[in-house]
Amino acid sequence: MTLCFCGWLLGQTSTPMVTIKGGSYVPLYGVKGENKATKPVNVKSFQLDIYPVTNAQYKAFLEKHPEWRRSRVKGIFAQKSYLSHWKSDLEFSPLEAQAPVTHISWFAAKKYCECEGKRLPTTDEWEYVAQADAQNIDARKKKHYQEYIVRSMQTPKTYLQKVGNTPKNYWGVYDMHGLVWEWVADFNSVLLSGDSRKDKQGDDALFCGGSALNASDLTNYGAFMRYALRGSLKANYTMLNMGFRCAL
């Protein structure tokens, strides 16, 4: 596990990153093998921001890329609610400077990461990191992990808290749970549609009304919620509790 501070301690805007060693995990939904069990997915080593992107960092991006300010961004790239919690194009409450930026579309998050020389993490990368607690790479079946996920989802207005507010996990990554939902690069690879599901193996990865029976872990409440949310999104959607972080 390697820390890459990327100028954070020098007052620059890039978030520190950690190297996530590659491995495999069993996704909540995936392709079934001959024994009807969900096949593990291999995840290659990559780097991930230890925090979600903050309001202050996103403001610095907008200063360099004015076409993404809320008064100028095109509707095809972001809904009218884009950055609606800010007072103006470049102004927000000083108390929110280190809170995660929200009301951000997938297009905007993708562009920010590209301008940082990074990218959005894939669903598999994000879920691979999110399954860890402080001591274990995969803590999904542990009672304390499940209770923490449910408790964090019941806490209101977590998007107002500063990044780094939650304990870091095994990889040294903060806020994977308990702060905001996060965009991933391939969010629309999971569909929320009962009508679109066809009777073939490849569609086992689709999330639909009755697909809980095809899930690999019925106790993973947090993953159910994330898959359902991703399946309902469009790339220009913005939400009060939806932020992002970058990968490399």
Task: Give each language-model segment a name.
Residues S71-H85, E127-A130:
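Acidic helix-start/capping segments at beta-turn-to-alpha-helix junctions
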Residues S14-A78, I104-F107, G178:
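A short glycine-rich, aromatic-capped structural motif
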Residues L28-G30, D186, A247:
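A generic structural motif
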Residues T238-L248:
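Short, structured beta-strand segments at or near domain termini in extracellular proteins/domains
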Residues I20, V26, W86-G231, A235-L240:
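Functional-site microenvironments in short loops/helix caps that host divalent-cation chemistry
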Residues L9-T13:
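Boundary at the C-terminal end of the N-terminal hydrophobic targeting segment
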Residues M1-G7:
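Bacterial N-terminal signal peptides
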